[in-house]
């Protein structure tokens, strides 16, 4: 079973401390390794943001709640 906190895919929605993020895209390097996560807020029209996979995993560490899982 995939954990969206560690292995995000487009469509995943996570929340932590009142902040909600929806994964919109995943950037990979030439070898296929995930390097960056592009995310935004699921209901407001705010600019998309890009985070490294390590900062994404640090943000979701332990206390982030999965609201919705995207199709893997």
Role assignments for model-derived ranges:
Residues 43-72:
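Intrinsically disordered, low-complexity, charged/polar segments
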Residues 12-22:
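Short coil-to-beta-strand transition motifs
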Residues 8-12, 35:
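Short structural boundary motif marking the start of a folded domain
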Residues 1-9:
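Mixed-charge, Lys/Arg-rich low-complexity intrinsically disordered regions
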Residues 20-51:
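Basic/aromatic-rich interaction segments and small domains that mediate binding to polyanionic partners
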Residues 6, 15, 29-31:
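A generic structural signal for short, solvent-exposed coil/turn residues
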